[in-house]
Amino acid sequence: MYFSEQNKMIRKLARDFAEKELTTEILDEVEESGEFPQEILDKMAKFGFFGIKIPKSLGGSGGDHMSYVICMEEFARVSGVASVYLSSPNSLAGGPLLLSGTEEQIEKYLKPIITGKKKLAFALTEPGAGSDAGGMSTTAVDMGDYYLLNGRKTFITMAPLCDDAVIYAKTDMSKGTRGISAFIVDLKSEGVSMGKNEHKMGLIGCATSDIIMEDVKVPKENRLGEVNKGFSNAMKTLDVGRLGVASQSIGVAQGALDEAIKYAKERKQFGKRIADFQAIAFMIADMATKLEAAKLLVYNAASLMDNKKNATKEASMAKFYASEICNEICAKAVQIHGGYGYIKEYKVERMYRDCRVFTIYEGTSQVQQMVISGMLLKK
């Protein structure tokens, strides 16, 4: 229905890579150390995953949004945190540059993250401005030759690992969201510091921290796009970002369902497999049906984007439903495993922790409902 021959080839490539490289031993080590192996990231870059949906003319692999969804799904099925690294250059990090970057900015910032030579963070959220991104207090004052940035961004994925960050700041405090501009900030600049490395529930192996800016001088050529047009850049970037989280969600959910089915067939109680009990069998049927529905929402949103159609509502629907049912499926997978599901030795324990953030980051479920209802009910 949705997949081209190229899409099918990319699915096989992504699945084979994830299953071969992301072994249980490596993922257990990531959980213990909190660090993701650089050699695997280098291989992901070499295979073209970091530019899977970026045009070849810009150094990417030239795939479509469906190819991106497929790669995210297959990586997340094995490792949620690996899919975060895959997502970044294709989505939140690369997106702002694809939308508004100059030739020089593309060359200097986009191409190096595609090849894996550099990492770029997306910094929108603040301590007092999460869902209400327009309520940010970070400022950028035009000083003539440069902008002077002051403020704090919070919960920034990969911030401690990144070379640069796309920072959104108020250039006109009187205009609300229409007074926000985007900037590319060198994180080694004077006045930039990192908050503590957050100890997260899940997605261990991808550091998260605040970015603090105190009188940071940013060259004029590092403004991304037009003055006061940054909020539009951020929102358009998040459309693709939400597609990415939806893809993560169906991937992790598929992994959890696979583990639940496998365990239900092997585990015996009362003299028979627990899969033979209707309570378990119906639970699995429910999980599989909801997952299939979520996949169709995700693929539909990707298809609309590939056909150059507005998919804001559909991306929000996909993100909302897929993330919610992923949490439900992972919880049921743990339940099917019984006590073993609570033990780190079993994969579903990690999946259960990893998926919890899917209903929160890149727009909470409640924000998605606001977007969906707003588009349906507007005059």
Curated annotation (Swiss-Prot):
Binding-site residues, substrate: S131, D239, V240, G241, R242, G363
EC number, as in UniProt: 1.3.1.108
Main location group: cytoplasm
Comment on bound cofactor: Binds 1 or 2 FAD per subunit.
Catalyzed reaction equations: hydrocaffeoyl-CoA + 2 reduced [2Fe-2S]-[ferredoxin] + 2 NAD(+) = (E)-caffeoyl-CoA + 2 oxidized [2Fe-2S]-[ferredoxin] + 2 NADH
Keywords: Cytoplasm, FAD, Flavoprotein, NAD, Oxidoreductase
Cofactor: FAD
KW Iron (keyword) present: no
Residues of the active site: E362
UniProt family annotation: Belongs to the acyl-CoA dehydrogenase family.
PANTHER family found in the cross-reference section: ACYL-COA DEHYDROGENASE, ISOVALERYL-COA DEHYDROGENASE, MITOCHONDRIAL-RELATED
Stated role: The Caffeyl-CoA reductase-Etf complex catalyzes the reduction of caffeyl-CoA to yield hydrocaffeyl-CoA. It couples the endergonic ferredoxin reduction with NADH as reductant to the exergonic reduction of caffeoyl-CoA with the same reductant. It uses the mechanism of electron bifurcation to overcome the steep energy barrier in ferredoxin reduction. Also reduces 4-coumaroyl-CoA and feruloyl-CoA.
Stated name of the protein: Caffeyl-CoA reductase-Etf complex subunit CarC
Source organism per UniProt: Acetobacterium woodii (strain ATCC 29683 / DSM 1030 / JCM 2381 / KCTC 1655 / WB1)
